[in-house]
C-alpha cells in the first residue's frame, strides 16, 4: 500500500500580517488619555504666571495651558511613538513598520475630528474651538504627511525589489490602487495647503481640504489590510455625522437690519442684526459664523463660513458687528468692487444669510468674575472684540482700573465707532472715574477725510474658516512701527494732537494723533495697580495684527500678568 504524500498548508498571511492591530488600539487609547488630560488641565490647570517662579517656567506653563502645538504635539507623539519600533526587525521585516505608518495616520483622525467639533460639549466649559486652531492645523499636516510617507515608502520598496512588479503591485491590485489614489489626493491637499497657495485661493484649499478628508476616511478601510472598519471607521463616521448635525440643528436664517458704511473714507462698517438670532445670554467677545448660502445649497457645505466678533452685549437690543470689508477698487468705485470682487465677502441688506451658530470667546471664566484691574489693547477691526469687554468691565462697580487702547490708521474709523455709540445711546458719563479711560491712537493725519491711497488691495481672508473677526491686509499694515515718533515726523508736518472730541464721553475718550506709542508708558498706572491686587484680578486683553499681539504678550510675560488674546491672522 502506497503512502499518501505529505501535504503542507501555507499560511495566506505571514506572521506579521496582524502585527499592527494592537498598535492601532494603543494609539486610540493614547488619544483618549490625552483628551482626559486636556480636560483636567483646563479645569484645574493654572495659566497665571507666578510672580515667584522663573520666566522660563512661567512660559512653559502658559504654553502648556494655551495648547501650544509644539508642546502638546510633542507630548502626544512621544507617547504614540514609544512602542512604534518594537519586536520586529527594521531590515528584514520593514513592511510591518510601513504598514504601521498608515495605521497610525488613520488611528489619529478620531482625535482630530473630536477637537474640531463646534460646539464640543465635552470641553465646552473650559475650552472653545478657537483654542485648538493652531493645534488642529499642525496636527492635520502631520497626519497627512504620515499617511503620504506610508504610500511613498511602499512604492520605493516595490520599485527597488527585482522580484516584484511595481505595476502588478500598485495598479493591478485593487486594494493597493485605492491606496495610490489616496496618496495622490493627499499630495494635492498638501500642495494646496502651502501658505502662498492657501492665501491665493483659500476657497480652493477649503474645498480640497474637506473633500480629501472625507475621501481619506472612507477609502482607507477599502485599502487597509487588516481592516480598520471597527472601531476607527465607525468612530470617524460618527464624528463626521455630529459635525453635519451641528451645522444643521443650530443654523438659522437671518437678514441684515441696517448697515452703516462710507467706502470713500474707510472700509470699516457697522452692521446691525436682529437680537432674536442669539440666545438671551452670550459672553462679551463672543463671535458668530455666517454663510451666504442656505443649508440646502451644496455651497453651504463646500465653501467656508465667515466669522464675526459680536461688538454688542447680551442686554443690547440688537446684534452689532464692526467689521472691515475688503476692496480692490479704484477711487470712486468702492461699492461696485465689493459687489463684483470674488475675493471679498460683504454683508448686504437685500440678501438672506445663514447663521451657523454663536461661539464663546477664549476668555477664562475667572476673568469675568474676578478681574478688577483691566487693560484692553486692540488695533483696527479688533475694536469689535475690545468694545464689549470694555463695556462689561465698565459696568462692574468693583473694577479699580480700566483702560482701552485702540490703534487705527485714520480718523474715519473712529468716526464710525463714535456714530455706533451715539446711535445706540451708549454713554459712560454716569459711572465715569479717573481710572476708566479710552485712548485712541491715530497713525495717519487727523482729518475727517481719509486718503484714498490708504485703501489697500486685499486678498481672500486665509483664516476665514478658522479665525475670528474681519482681519485683512489693512489691519496687518497697522504695525506698531507706524506709531513711533520717527515715523510720525516723516509722514508729514502734522503736529502731535491730543483732545477729547465728544461732549457725551468727553472725559472718557482721548484721541491722539501722530503720538509715539510706548506700551509700558501707556500702562504705567495699570502696572502699578497690578502690584496692589491679587494676581488673578489683573488681566490684559489684546486683539489685532500680529505685531500688536507679540508686543502685548511680551509685556505680560515680562510683568507676569494674565494675558488673553484673539488672533486675527494665522
Swiss-Prot record:
Domain FAD-binding FR-type: 250-388
InterPro entries to which the protein is assigned, alphabetical: FAD-bd_8, Fe3_Rdtase_TM_dom, Fe_red_NAD-bd_6, FNR_nucleotide-bd, RBOH/FRE
Membrane topology annotation: Multi-pass membrane protein
Residue spans crossing the bilayer: 21-41, 70-90, 101-118, 142-162, 177-197, 204-224, 230-250
Domain Ferric oxidoreductase per the UniProt entry, residue ranges: 101-219
Biased composition (Polar residues): 481-505
EC number per UniProt: 1.16.1.-
Location of this chain's protein in the cell: Membrane
UniProt entry keywords in alphabetical sequence: Electron transport, FAD, Flavoprotein, Ion transport, Membrane, NADP, Oxidoreductase, Transmembrane, Transmembrane helix, Transport
GO CC annotation terms, alphabetical: plasma membrane
GO BP term (any one): reductive iron assimilation
Gene3D superfamilies per record: Nucleotide-binding domain of ferredoxin-NADP reductase (FNR) module (3.40.50.80)
GO molecular function: ferric-chelate reductase activity
Statement: the UniProt record of this protein carries the keyword NADP: yes
Chain spans, region Disordered: 481-507
Keyword Signal attached: no
Pfam families in the cross-refs: FAD_binding_8, Ferric_reduct, NAD_binding_6
PANTHER family noted in UniProt: METALLOREDUCTASE AIM14-RELATED, NADPH OXIDASE
Known function: Probable cell surface metalloreductase. May be involved in iron or copper homeostasis.
Oligomer status and interactors: Interacts with ribosomes.
Protein family: Belongs to the ferric reductase (FRE) family. AIM14 subfamily.
Name of the molecule in the record: Probable metalloreductase AIM14
Species this protein is from: Saccharomyces cerevisiae (strain RM11-1a)
Underlying gene: AIM14
